[in-house]
């Protein structure tokens, strides 16, 4: 498994970072996790082929995590992509996504490739092939908004993920809201990827000791919180400091050997 960070910014637009997107590659497919605003430009900047994406997985429907999707599909059409594209989304959001793409004038009949939208439930093991699967669990990132939807029209689903193949295992928190959301999965993994905007830095040291991942990679970094993250790292013990990395756009996890904030 290889992981490339296409977008490592927060919800606040930055000239230095694109919005959230992670590319997970195996020997058989490419999976894009989230596709925030500006993802198509991020593809060009990092020389990613629009035709190379086989699957897209959406963690939640905040704008910085999904609004780049229509533009990305448009670029795929313009380069005459032929291979199928499957978009994975929580079951509560499937109808919305179908309507969103329809209202973006992305009609299936006019695409050069087949677009499938597949819904899934939390806790289900979703197999991408014989050696790769993911499990999604719901976190509390969107819970604070429930008071604004008395008619319960929205699902308020924000997901964290566990990925595994024959070589590697990964936890990706997605956007979260509390320390508890860091522990939705308790598996020992090589790579623990966490957002860093909605959680205090001191909790990351606990992750390194309690869950003991080989590497902790922080993303979803705003221009404002970069300094506090660096200060946090500088105050860590040498043994822990060597295991924490700050992702920047283009960060290749498979070959990382130094922090690159």
Language-model features and meaning:
Residues 1-171, 230-261:
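Binuclear metal-dependent hydrolase catalytic cores
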Residues 177-191, 199-261:
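Binuclear metal-ion centers of metallo-dependent hydrolases, dominated by the metallo-beta-lactamase
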Residues 173-175:
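DG-centered beta-turn motif at the end of beta-strands
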Residues 10, 149, 192, 220-221:
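Conserved short-loop catalytic and cofactor-binding motifs
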């Amino acid at each position: 498994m290889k992981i490339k960070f296409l977008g490592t910014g927060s919800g606040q637009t930055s000239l230095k970072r694109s919005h959230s997107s992670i590319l997970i590659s195996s020997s058989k497919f490419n999976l894009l996790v989230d596709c925030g605003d500006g993802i198509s430009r991020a593809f060009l900047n990092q020389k990613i082929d629009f035709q190379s994406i086989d699957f897209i997985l959406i963690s939640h429907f905040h704008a910085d995590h999904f609004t780049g999707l229509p533009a990305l599909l448009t670029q795929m059409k313009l380069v005459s992509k032929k291979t199928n594209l499957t978009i994975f989304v929580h079951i509560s959001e499937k109808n919305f996504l179908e309507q969103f793409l329809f209202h973006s004038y992305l009609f299936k009949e006019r695409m050069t490739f087949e677009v499938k939208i597949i819904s899934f439930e939390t806790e289900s093991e979703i197999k991408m092939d014989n050696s790769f699967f993911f499990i999604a669990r719901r976190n509390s990132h969107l819970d604070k908004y429930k008071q604004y939807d008395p008619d319960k029209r929205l699902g308020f689903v924000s997901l964290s993920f566990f990925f595994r193949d024959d070589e590697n295992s990964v936890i990706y928190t997605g956007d979260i809201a509390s320390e508890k959301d860091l522990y939705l999965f308790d598996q020992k993994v090589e790579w623990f990827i966490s957002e860093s905007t909605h959680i205090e830095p001191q909790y990351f040291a606990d992750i390194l000791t309690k869950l003991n991942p080989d590497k902790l990679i922080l993303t979803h970094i705003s221009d404002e919180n970069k300094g506090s993250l660096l200060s946090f790292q500088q105050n860590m013990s040498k043994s822990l400091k060597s295991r924490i990395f700050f992702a920047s756009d283009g960060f290749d996890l498979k070959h990382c050997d130094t922090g690159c904030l």
